[in-house]
């Protein structure tokens, strides 16, 4: 029997690092890059295998087959470029002022290692600012015996003035900015530590121990009455011997704070709020957010804007892409110029055009414009501003008006369809897919696109219960259930729809 052959193990410690460096060199040289990352107006080329291995965001996009990935424009392009370089090198240089931007970009790309590191950087930067200011060193009195400490606590609790429950709680007094932001501070919590600077020099060497205690204990003590009992441990009140609690209670009685908002906060809370900016500067008193009323109704006390003219007005005299200040245009916020010389508008009687009653036309949106009724005769003065491409005025007894697109010469009998079609030519795509970040000019296009991600068959046939992903497919299917048929007069072939018959008749040779 032959002896067992020797097995040699080859292990290169820096092989993975050198491989990434080689890939990074290929990326910088533009070799073998198979994916493009776009951020705002900038773009960069990279290898899809590296991006998918380092970022779940890129992996999800690449699994959908995208060769061009758009990063949401919430962070600067340079920050995303740094994170892509981090995937190749494993090193990242973060300045103190840029930590929040890098954290935001890493959260979008879902790079967990960078998220953890930036979170620690921000936490270390805010740790000195959130703690209470260091008091001046004072002589520390000798610790009291447990019996003396209990006697002192009973004396302080009995001498606490009525109407100020919880004023002797030193742990709550250290958290005015964290606990009192939504509402004005109470006398006990706001004036406790900063009532008298000369009395706040008591030693407070616990550091962050009180800050690290859970808020559940504080909430529980608030519900029970706010004061400590006899069974609590002595270390909870290390400042009793220095008279800190009595001074805090007296200062709370002498100077009750006025509910002046952010001006009552002091120490670290004031520094934190001053650095973040006053809330009054950001949101004035008259500000009411649009999401307070889900139904879109204006809340009481909110100033309302003057309603704009509800009629469909298309202006073609302005240059393309120019938006004028003031209230938004009723139909769509863009202006298209005709490719050729503008057609002269038909003559119209002088004077302002009569506006329809407000109850007939609601406030219009780009996708919800009212359609022209076939039996309705518009006012003669509204004809010059109805369409920029020389739409003919309608006279009684004539054919329904047609709206012709000045770009592709496509005609429409409905003003609603014409408006939606003109919005496509504007180049604006305000509707964006939340999965692949593709943008669409109309909401209908976005809804049709979302079926590719969800696969939901929301349209069902009422006759045979067959389901379809698109409404157009359902409409085509419903033709098979119609009892009437359109026969061909030449060959006798039967069709379910007249459009199919007309197409078939066009194929017949002329007699």
Swiss-Prot record:
Segments forming domain BTB: 33-96
Region listing for Disordered, in residue ranges: 159-241, 294-403
An annotated Gene Ontology molecular function: sequence-specific double-stranded DNA binding
Keywords recorded for this protein, A-Z: DNA-binding, Metal-binding, Neurogenesis, Nucleus, Repeat, Transcription, Transcription regulation, Zinc, Zinc-finger
Record field: compositional bias (Pro residues): 339-360
SUPFAM superfamilies to which the protein is assigned, alphabetical: beta-beta-alpha zinc fingers, POZ domain
Function: May be involved in transcriptional regulation. In the central nervous system, may play a role in glial cell differentiation.
Family: Belongs to the krueppel C2H2-type zinc-finger protein family.
Official protein name in the record: Zinc finger and BTB domain-containing protein 45
